Amino acid sequence: NPLIKMMIQQQEILKKTAEGAMFTDFTIEQPDGSKVSLSDYVRKGKYVLVDFWASWCGPCRAEIPNIKELYDKYHSKGLDVLGVAVWDKVEDTQKAIKELGIVWPQIINAQQIPTELYGIQGIPHIILFAPDGTIVARDLREEAMKEKVAEVMKK
């Protein structure tokens, strides 16, 4: 049964990318032809908050001020933030980055590559990675995201 097969696959993906698991890398060609990978940012000795988002997604746009607050508060203390634009047109992503005043790095034009790898079915989906590349927490939003980042940055 294809539906059961799909559900089993989804469970396996979620197990592989659960809290405590090592990050799964991916590489995306950027509009300028360069290639960028998650591993260019994750497992570099810092906590990294990764926001999987799209320009057309209202809740994604609403989360940006919360991410900006964390970036402003903790970036100088060693927190990195990375945006990964999924399911979106390059020009729409670039326009949204300007409109929203996003200053942290972005992997754009990722489409469904990372969402399939991480079993992400809805966005925004925000994952906090530890300095060693393990997943600290998945699907962080609003106050829960702020609390989790504050907790790890105290250590």
Enumerate the language-model features and the residues they cover:
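N-proximal helix/coil linker or "cap" segments that precede and/or mark the start of modular domains
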Residues: 1-31, 36-45, 95-98
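Short loop/turn microsegments at loop-to-beta-strand junctions
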Residues: 23-24, 48, 123-124
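Extracytoplasmic and endomembrane cell-envelope/extracellular-matrix remodeling and assembly machinery
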Residues: 28-34, 89, 145-147
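Short, contiguous acidic/charged loop-to-helix segments that flank catalytic cores in large enzymes
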Residues: 37-41, 55-59, 84-88, 115-117, ...
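Conserved redox-active cysteine motifs that mediate thiol-disulfide chemistry
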Residues: 46, 52-69
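Hydrophobic beta-strand anchors of alpha/beta hydrolase catalytic cores
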Residues: 49-50, 81, 126
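Structural microenvironment flanking redox-active thiols in thiol-disulfide oxidoreductases
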Residues: 61-100, 110-117, 147
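Thiol/disulfide oxidoreductase modules built on the thioredoxin-like
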Residues: 96-102, 109-153
